[in-house]
Each structure stands twice: as structure tokens, then as C-alpha cells.
Amino acid sequence: MARICLSLNRLKVAVIPVLALLAAGCGDSRSAKAPPLAENEASRIVPALDPVGMPRLRDSTLFELSYPAAELKGGSVKLHAGEWKDSLTPDNLREAYLTMVAHGDLNGDSLRDAVVILYTDPGSTRKFFRLIPVIASTTKEPEMLGGTVGYGAFLGDRVKPESLWIDGHRVWLRMVEPAKGDDPCCPTLWQQRTYRLVRDSLKLETTIPLGNHD
């Protein structure tokens, strides 16, 4: 029976959630597969300004960038409409896509940056998640920001990100990761992490255990 493992963020900064991260039985090698953000959000029109009236990176910009992915050939992946599939492999087994996006100021320049979670499947039982910053910059169009992809943080294999937001120039993440003795497919350790941007890289700042997650 599938479990819904992805919750909506209810805190201060608006977050664009994906639908649900489905975890099938422990014997399913694709149990940590998350639905693509673009696939579920493609019909939604996201305003260029967030509620406080400050310009932010458009999701359409984030969906077309290249992101680091060490387990894929070349070490990076160029997304189109928020996802990528390797058409040269049988059944498109290798793929990558965004599963979460949050907006907020990471470096104190009053521009709304973004942070994304990238899911990659290299065509094996292992499924990887990365937390990656996208640093906003001004363009000739006042309400259109450019984005530079920074260096992210590796979250792990078959972890379950649940909520993501930016507040106080920090990235906040709640996720479930394997505890000691867990089967890789079925993590139970619930944690809250904070990251801060140092130049163009995300650095882990705090980790707070939240207990076991059913």
C-alpha cells in the first residue's frame, strides 16, 4: 500500500509543493521515485511576484537550467520543462527531474533566490536527491530575474524530502532518511536541517532529530 510521504509547507515563505512522494513496498526498486514537479504543475500559472511584491525567479526559468548530477554521464543534466529522460536507454530508465522548489532571499541582496530538490535515477536501484541553490540576478526586464545554479548538497539515496522553505536567509528542510538498521528502501529517521549559502554553495548548518517517522 502506498504511503504519502510529501507534505505541504505551511510556514512563512511560499513553497511550490509537488503532489506526493509515493513509497511502494520495500521490494520495489523504484519505491523512492517522486513525481516530476513540472508534470504536476505545468497547468498552474505562477505569478512573477510573490505576495510581498518582490520579483522572484520564475519556475519556467528553473525548469530549463542545467543542474549537477555526478551519477549521470558528464556530471550534470540539462532539464526541459523540469525533467530529463535518457531516450537512448531501454524504457527511459535513466531520468532526472525537480521534485520541490522554494523561493526566498538566500544572500541578503533582497532578490528572491530559489532552492530546488533534484531527483536522479541512474538506471539502478539507487535513487538520488540533491538540494541545489539557484541565485537570482537582475536582468534588463525589471520583473524578470536570471538564475545561476550554485553548488548543492547531496541528500542521499532513497531519502524522502517532506517540506522545503526559505526563511532568515536559510534553507529549511524536513526529510526522512535511513536510520541505523533501516532497509535502504524504507527510511524512518525524521530530521529537520538548515543550510546557508556560502558564496555559491549550500553548507549544512544544523541537524535536529524529530523522531521516527512511520
Predicted features, each with a name:
Residues 2-15:
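Bacterial N-terminal signal peptides that target proteins for export
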Residues 27-106, 111-214:
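Beta-propeller-forming repeat regions
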Residues 22-25:
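C-terminal motif of bacterial Sec signal peptides marking the signal peptidase cleavage site
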Residues 18:
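C-terminal active-site/capping subdomain that shapes the small-molecule cofactor and substrate pocket
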